[in-house]
Amino acid sequence: MLVQCDATMLAAVALAQGKEQSRYYLKGVCFDREYAVATDGHLMTVAKAGVSYGSVDKGAEIPEPVVMPVSTKAITAMKKSAASHVLFDGETLKVFDDGGAVLYIEQCESIDCTFPNWRGVIPTVEEDAECAAAFSNVLLAKLAATATILSGGATIGVTLKGSDALSPHK
């Protein structure tokens, strides 16, 4: 099975993957249908990352979620402006540019595990609904790093809205 996704989105999501050996199943990015998901058990990043799957059998159904470790070196390669997409074949991770040239390659096997039920953690919110969030300095640093990757270094802003006791206040 082949998994292909957007390099920038994967780099941003991978910042949230775990590092603890005791929770080895969090030490990678989970590809679940069109989503890339990573968590360290405290912070979770979910993104529609342009995930597509290749198979010898073109009629094959979308596979079960697969968890792939993403190294710091791979994340660095994905953050380069020339990086376009990433291809993972179960044994190797390759970062490509728009022309199809390989920018980075590393051996990496998928993690044989069951990834946590991330859909049960992410609240469903109607588009116009206000929602609340609380942020620690560690989380804000990771959010800033994620936003920097996604914006290409451009200045960004975050707006927090809320009107109840649990909402962020000005």
Model-predicted segments: where are they?
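DNA polymerase processivity clamps
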Residues: 1-170
